[in-house]
Swiss-Prot record:
The keyword DNA damage applies. Keywords: DNA damage, DNA recombination, DNA repair, Metal-binding, Zinc, Zinc-finger. Pfam families: RecR_C, RecR_HhH, RecR_ZnF, Toprim_4. GO terms for biological process: DNA recombination; DNA repair. Residues 80-175 form the Toprim domain. SMART domains: TOPRIM (SM00493). This is Recombination protein RecR. InterPro entries: DNA_Rcmb_RecR, Rcmb_RecR, Rcmb_RecR_Znf, TOPRIM_dom, TOPRIM_RecR. It comes from Rickettsia canadensis (strain McKiel). GO terms for molecular function: DNA binding; zinc ion binding. A zinc finger (C4-type) spans 57-72.
């Protein structure tokens, strides 16, 4: 089947999305093109809308329509507890569990020699400033259970030693090598409830 370069380019772009290969990308493109006046235009309009409206929260790093996200500005959140997550995907996963009512701090990365991510790329100075300014009582390290996530967790623990907050880690239930975004809500809820002091 010969496809135009524009279609090939669209298939290529979709195939770069997480979890999609070239076959799935081709199916998506065909689905969109079969009713492009409705499906494709709706997708385009939504993407343009998101591009214009979505910003990174100035406090935690979440993505929202406001400079200070709904979580950080909520009066119903426990402002004495911060969960440190690697990316917004993990923040959203914890929110889906419905079990965590504190605040978040998105690092943006984990420490990884392979991908050349180093401590200076993490948002740790901002975290320490938040901990002191908001009188944080507990910091929950909610990094993934991968080697990089564990390394990042240990580094954060050392970094926060000068702050008196209790430092805890999500409990078992998260498999070694597992990523929060792929866990079901029940497993993540149990991990939040059974979190343990970080040693």
């Amino acid at each position: 089947m010969n496809e135009t370069n524009d279609i090939d380019q669209l298939i290529y772009l979709f195939s770069k999305l997480p979890g999609l290969g070239s076959r799935s990308a081709r199916r998506i493109v065909l689905y969109l093109l079969q009713d492009k006046d409705v499906r494709l235009k709706s997708l385009i309009n939504n993407l343009i809308n998101i591009d214009k409206k979505i910003v990174k929260c100035e406090i935690c790093g979440n993505m929202d329509t406001e400079n200070i996200c709904r979580i950080c500005s909520s009066e119903y959140r426990d402002k004495s507890v911060i969960a440190i997550v690697e990316t917004v995907a993990e923040l959203w996963a914890m929110e889906r569990s419905g079990n965590f009512k504190g605040l978040y701090h998105v690092l943006g990365y984990n420490l990884s020699a392979a991908s050349r991510k180093n401590p200076s790329m993490l948002r740790l100075p901002e975290l320490l400033t938040r901990c002191f300014a908001a009188n944080i009582k507990e910091v929950i390290i909610a990094t993934n259970s991968t080697l990089e996530g564990q390394t990042t967790a240990y580094f954060i623990t050392e970094y926060l030693k000068e702050h008196p907050a209790k430092i805890s880690r999500l409990a078992s239930g998260i498999p070694i090598g597992g990523e929060l975004d792929y866990l079901d809500e029940g497993t993540l809820s149990a991990a939040i409830n059974l979190r343990q002091p970080f040693e």
